[in-house]
Amino acid sequence: MFTGDADNVWVSVNRFFGEMIPTFDMARKVTLTVDLAKVIEDFKDIIAIAPEGPELLIPKDRLTDSEILQFYLLAAYVSFRLGKRLTDAMTKEELQAKLGKSMKITATRLGELVKQSIVTKTEDGSFRIATIGVKKLQEDLKAIKTEIW
């Protein structure tokens, strides 16, 4: 709380903000955030949000199993952020059905993604894409699109 006459309070307020704004600016520089509008724009040709759930618009045979899982989790993330889904997580069973491979392969790929911190496992055993996972997908997008098209 600032006390004193108006001039002293004004000086104190300016000093406070002068000290705090650089701290906020530094914190902003190291805080990892996702620009949802950019994610939607970047991935609009790859993922879709259907009433039935997350979908891919590209042939799965052009992607690795890990990429497929990441794209489905990204679609769930976007769907949740847009209020179209109750959670941004998907169960192992949902992901296995989307991947179209055995549960063992699905679990192995998910385990690898968790180990790389691209995906996180929730308390109930579901999976969600991590913020760093979204960023890495954005960084890898050009190479992935080259492989696809």
Predicted regions and their residues:
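Short, cationic, amphipathic peptide segments
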Residues: 1-3
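Short amphipathic alpha-helical elements of helix-turn-helix/winged-helix folds
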Residues: 71-79
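A short, conserved structural fragment
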Residues: 114-124
